[in-house]
């Protein structure tokens, strides 16, 4: 019985740890291919404000506003495509 409880405890801890990370795209090309595991709960995508098809960067977190750059922040895995 103690072994079963210990096993359940370990599984719970592992599952909670996996749930605390996110997967975000992390690159500067239009093709979303490279991913990174993030501790933050948000992903971002930067693009040129007047030319949204030009991606200036993707990654973890939510950076502050910049002139001439549109920043889209989101809160789910691979949401910054």
UniProtKB/Swiss-Prot annotation:
A GO MF label: toxin activity
Role noted for this protein: Is cytotoxic against A549 cells (LC(50)=106 ug/ml).
UniProt subcellular location: Secreted
Source organism of the structure: Dendroaspis angusticeps
Tissue specificity statement from the Swiss-Prot or TrEMBL entry: Expressed by the venom gland.
Comment field (misc): Negative results: is not cytotoxic to MDA-MB-231, HT-29 cells, and HUVEC cells at concentrations up to 300 ug/ml and is not hemolytic at concentrations up to 1mg/ml. Does not inhibit the growth of reference strains of E.coli or S.aureus (MIC values >200 ug/ml).
Intrachain disulfide bonds: 24-43, 38-60, 62-73, 74-79
Family of the protein in this entry: Belongs to the three-finger toxin family. Short-chain subfamily. Orphan group XI sub-subfamily.
Record protein name field: Toxin F-VIII
Signal peptide bounds: 1-21
GO cellular component labels: extracellular region
């Amino acid at each position: 019985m103690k072994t079963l409880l210990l096993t359940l405890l370990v599984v719970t801890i592992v599952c909670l740890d996996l749930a605390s990370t996110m997967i975000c795209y992390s690159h500067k090309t239009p093709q979303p291919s490279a991913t990174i595991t993030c501790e933050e709960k948000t992903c971002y995508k930067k693009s040129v404000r007047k030319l949204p098809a030009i991606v200036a960067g993707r990654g973890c977190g939510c950076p502050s506003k910049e002139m001439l750059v549109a920043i889209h922040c989101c809160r789910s895995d691979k949401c910054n495509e």
